[in-house]
Amino acid sequence: MEEVPRRQPGGLVEVEGVFQFYEDWECWDYVSQRVSDERLQRWLAMLTNNQLRRQVIREAQIWMWKHKGAAVRRNCGCRLCNPGWGSQVRNVEL
């Protein structure tokens, strides 16, 4: 039986950010279930601003490298399951 080819960092040509998207998603899925509530709420609030997305992923990667054996704290790290700072709709008066 053939083995599925594995992704190697920098070894494959990235097509329109597809590989980067999945790597970011896997990182977020892993980390968002394990970080403290305060850090998760901060990151969720930062994700409402598209310019801060790369910074959030970078911080998540650093956290993941430093805390390799971290225990799972929650089933889901999404904004719906973890309402807080980043969940409120912002009304802006112009």
Curated annotation (Swiss-Prot):
InterPro entries the record matches: Lentiviral_Vpr-like
A Pfam family recorded for this sequence: Lentiviral_Tat
Keyword Chaperone in annotation: no
GO CC, one annotated term: host cell nucleus
Residues that span the membrane, as ranges: none
Protein's UniProt keywords contain Transmembrane helix: no
This protein's UniProt keywords: Cell cycle, Host nucleus, Virion
Location of the protein in the cell: Virion; Host nucleus
Described purpose of this protein according to its UniProt entry: Seems to function as a Vpr-like protein, since it mediates host cell cycle arrest in G2 phase. Cell cycle arrest creates a favorable environment for maximizing viral expression and production.
Protein name as catalogued: Probable Vpr-like protein
Organism in which the protein naturally occurs: Maedi visna virus (strain 1514)
Taxon lineage: Viruses, Riboviria, Pararnavirae, Artverviricota, Revtraviricetes
